Structures are given as C-alpha cells and as structure tokens.
Regions:
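Short hydrophobic/aromatic helix or loop-helix immediately within or flanking a transmembrane segment
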Residues: 54-79, 83-91
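Short periplasmic/luminal acceptor-recognition loop of GT-C membrane glycosyltransferases, typified by
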Residues: 444-527
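Extracytoplasmic loop-helix module adjacent to an early transmembrane segment
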Residues: 19-57, 69-72
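Hydrophobic, aromatic-rich transmembrane alpha-helices
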Residues: 95-98, 307-349
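Membrane-proximal stem/loop segments at transmembrane-domain junctions that anchor or position
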Residues: 223-308, 476-491
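Membrane-interface alpha helices of multi-pass inner-membrane proteins
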Residues: 157-174, 178, 183, 206-216
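Short hydrophobic alpha-helices at membrane interfaces in multi-pass membrane enzymes
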Residues: 108-114, 147-166, 197-205, 401-408
C-alpha cells in the first residue's frame, strides 16, 4: 500500500508540473530566455546568424552543440535549446519527487512541504529558462543522489551520472560549481571504497564522463588545437573580457584608468565604461594586447591573490547585496541549518554539517571577493540546498520526529512568499509582460526606420535578449544582437561581412550604414556621444 501511495504522490506531483508548463506557455507566450547568452546560443545553433546550423556554441560543449544542430536541422520550427533545458529540469524535478516519496520516517505533511518547494522552483524556471539554472539544477540533483547513496550504501550511479553529464555538456564552466559541491562526496568515496574496487568503479563511472567533458571543454580544446583559429582568437578575447568585466575591482580600475595609472593602457574612462556595460567593442581600441594589459591588472583581484587582497567586511556586504535579492530563500536555508544543529543526535553528523556549511560559505566568499553571484546562479543553488537538506534529514539520527513536519511546512510558506518578490514568479511575470510590450515597440521602431534595418548594441528598453525560449517563430522583428561581447564571435562576423560590414563594429556601422543603427539608454547615449 505504501508503494502505491508513493506512486500516486509522484504521479500527482508530476502532473502538476506538466499542467504548470502548459499553463504558463499558453498564458504568457512568448516566453523569453532569462539571459541574452541563451538567445545567442540558440541563434548560433539554429542558423539565425549564418543561415546554417552550427555545433560551435558560446559557453556550451561540442556534444551539446552537435545535439542541437541535429534537432534544429530536423525540426527547425522548435527552439530546441529551450525545450531541452526544460526537459532536463522537468526530469530532475521528477527524480526529486521520487526521492521525496521515499521519506517514510516523517508524516505526509513533511513530504507535502518539500513537494511544494520543488514545484515552486520549477515554476520560476518555466517562465525564465536559462542554461545556467539547468546545469545547476541537473548537476546538484545528481550530487544529492550521490550523497544519499553514500549514506544508505545503495550504490546506484546511472541516474546521478546522467544528471551530472547533462550539467557538464550544457554549461561546462557552470558545472564547476556542481563539481565543487560534489568534491567532498568524491573524496569520501575514494577513502571509504578504496579497497572495494567494484563499488569504486561504479562511482568513477558516474563521475568520469562529466568531469572529462568539463576538462576537455575548459582546457584540452585549446591545448590540442581542436578549435578553428577564429574561435581560438574569440575565446582568448572572451576569457580576457570575463576576467575584466565580472571582476569586483572594475570600479577601482575605472578610477585608475581615469588617473592614467595603468602603464601601457591607452583607454580613457569612456572606453572603460563602454567595456564595463558590454555595449561597444572597437577591435582597434580593445585589441588583444590592450585586453591582456587590463586582464593582467585585475589578476591581483582574482584567484588566490584576489582572496588575499579582499576586504572581509566589504566582501560580506557584497555577498549580502546578492543574497538580499532572494532573502526569503536565504532565511529558509539558515533556518533549516539551525534546526538540524539542534535536533541531530550524533556529534559526528553535527561536525559534518558545520564543516559543509563553512565549505559552502568559502565558495560564496570567493565569488563575492573575486567574481559575482547573480540570481540565475544563486537561486538554483539555494533552492537545491534547501531541497537536499530536507530530503537528507530523513536519513539522519535526530532527537525527535514528532514535529519535524513544521520545518518543511514553514519552509514552503516562505518559498511561496518569495514568489511575490521581484525575483520570484510574480516579479518575473510582470517583467515578462513588460518585455513583450517592449519587443512590440522595438519591432515597430525597426519597421519605421527601415524594414530591413539591423539593430546592433543596447536597446533603450532593456539589456536582455528578446528570443522566444520554446519556438523559433516570432511575430515581431527581433534584435540580431543585444550584447557587445558577441560582436567578435565568428558567426556574427560572418553575418556582418555578408552585409558589407568589414569589421562588425557597431560604431563604424552606426556612422556609415544607414540601414544599421544604434539605440542606447540615456546613460549609454551620453557615453556614446562623448566617444563619437
């Protein structure tokens, strides 16, 4: 009877996810990707820029690019990038439902609370899909299964291995965060099962494919020269840009640029502003040697040197600036950790919880000190830690199980309240409706200026991509490009050259081509005016 009840729970919860998907897609279409990166990925894969499908993706692996290329070639009307992301998150959520249904130690109310949290996490993803969230949700679900298997000594590795692999191929650099969370489990596996070769091999099989893809895409492609020359140059530029643009020291760098304190750097504060806002790249001004100088300058603020140079209180404030955007979720996570510290019986388990909490804090401190923690990274990590801890509680020795259901229900209430905040479902839905109106206005403006006009640069209405996440058809004229760092990508350069533009440079196009124009917001308009 218990098995039947579990199956019914999974069936009902899964049906709710399907209904949520259909309801949101029908009610709010067109749904846009959460970030412009996904719009660019789909544009590269489906041939929007070059007229033919491509396996070369920005931020994605060749394996994922090959899969997308085949699907776009067979059925080009579907936005396969978004559909695959949605399918993986749906599968991950159903796997989480399966794990929740196995919790027999506590009451049904306890399971209800976790079901609600998973459903709310899925709800946000459907209306704002992105490959970063997918990689984290899939990878951290696989990581949860590995930790649970180690606790229960039930060594099933196929599904965890699949989830980790999908995380790695969709976003190799995003998989680094997943690998960070999985690393203690990997060390523990090596320590405990070193003499049990059969079990050790099973776990290595689950880890190896994803880790191999991560290493290959992050390091080996460049070492063994498997990338075409134009893509090598692009990745060299992109990596330099990322270290500069996403670094917390960029404000300080601006001050030093304005004071001419960086030897050899020929930028003024205007060029630095254009670089920081990801709006305009002049291949002459932002040439490889200048980018390298800027990158070397910020090297003192990244990696180990960045941690050593960071100011503790300033970094904590920076972390809180990111965390306050999802503060209700953060409060839930803290509440669960405090609850566990109070109810766990075994000192060893308390010690492990404290050690893992410090381990996670170190990751956030590193990101706050030398990088950044945007919501699309922070939210899925916090959600998955909440869900994972609530599932793993049932496998721990605790003092009393009488009122444990309260922590699950209270957590679910706070998660529901979060949905009414700007970064929750209601806020995202309002922003989506606003963006739909913006796209119509952009389309009308493009038609008014020139039916065949091409927009390059930031639009005054917003900074993200207006690309439909689930179908390729668009009733409005959409933007070819919304982020400057893609200007140097080989497919975009190929498209620009086909239009008679020699260097794909927005400013040269702006001044010399009447059918291509630049629209900026008030601040960027002033900066562009200073430059021109």
């Amino acid at each position: 009877m218990k098995i039947n009840n579990s199956k019914i729970e999974i069936l009902i919860a899964s049906l709710i996810l399907v209904l949520i998907t259909l309801g949101i897609v029908l009610m709010y279409s067109p749904i846009y990707f959460h970030a412009n990166d996904d719009g660019i990925i789909s544009g590269l894969a489906n041939g929007q820029y070059t007229g033919k499908v491509s396996i070369e993706l920005i931020y994605g692996s060749k394996i994922y690019g090959s899969l997308l290329a085949v699907l776009y070639f067979i059925l080009p009307m579907f936005q396969w990038h978004g559909i695959i992301l949605l399918s993986i998150v749906l599968f991950s959520s159903i796997i989480l439902f399966l794990e929740i249904s196995k919790i027999e130690k506590f009451t049904f109310l306890y399971r209800i609370g976790i079901y609600i949290i998973v459903i709310n996490s899925y709800l946000i993803f459907v209306i704002s899909p992105t490959f970063t969230k997918t990689a984290l949700i899939s990878g951290l679900t696989g990581t949860l299964l590995i930790y649970k298997n180690l606790i229960t000594q039930n060594h099933k590795v196929i599904i965890p291995g699949f989830l980790l692999f999908m995380s790695a191929i969709i976003r190799p650099d995003g998989f680094a965060a997943v690998l960070y969370f999985a690393f203690p489990a990997l060390l523990y596996t090596l320590y405990i099962h070193l003499k049990n070769i059969k079990t050790l091999v099973r776990y290595m099989v689950s880890f190896f494919p994803s880790v191999f893809v991560f290493i290959q895409e992050t390091y080996l492609n460049d070492i063994f020269g498997r990338l075409p020359d134009e893509w090598k140059k692009y990745w060299q530029f992109l990596n330099a840009f990322h270290q500069i643009h996403t670094n917390p020291s960029m404000t300080k760098m601006h001050q030093e640029i304005a004071a001419f304190q960086i030897p050899g750097l020929e930028w003024t504060n205007v060029e630095a502003t254009l670089l920081t806002t990801v709006t305009y790249f002049d291949p002459i001004i932002f040439n490889p040697s200048q980018m390298e100088l800027a990158k070397n300058h910020v090297n003192d603020f990244i990696g180990i040197r960045g941690l050593l140079n960071s100011e503790f209180i300033l970094t904590l404030n920076r972390i809180w600036e990111y965390m306050v955007q999802i503060n209700y979720l953060f409060y839930v996570l803290l509440g669960i950790i405090l609850f566990l510290l109070l109810v766990i019986k075994k000192f060893g388990q308390v010690f492990l919880l404290l050690a893992f909490t410090l381990y996670v804090f170190f990751l956030y401190y590193y990101l706050g000190a030398v990088w950044r923690i945007p919501v699309r990274i922070n939210m899925p990590i916090i959600f998955m830690m909440i869900i994972s801890l609530l599932i793993l509680i049932s496998y721990l020795k605790i003092r009393s199980i009488k009122n444990v259901w309260l922590i699950s229900i209270i957590s679910s209430v706070f998660v529901i309240l979060f949905q009414f905040q700007p970064k929750g479902f209601i806020g995202i839905q309002e922003n989506l409706i606003k963006k739909q109106g913006e796209q119509e206005a952009i389309s009308n403006e493009l038609k008014r200026v020139n039916e065949n006009g091409i927009f390059i640069g930031h639009i005054k209405y917003g900074y993200e991509n207006y690309t439909n996440a689930y179908v390729t058809r668009n009733n409005h004229r959409s933007l070819d490009l919304t982020s400057g760092w893609h200007v140097f990508s080989p497919p975009w350069n190929q498209k620009a050259k086909s239009l008679g533009i020699s260097d794909a440079n927005p400013t040269f196009v702006f001044t010399n081509k009447k059918d291509v124009y630049f629209v900026g917001d008030d601040y960027m308009g002033q900066v562009m005016g200073m430059f021109l």
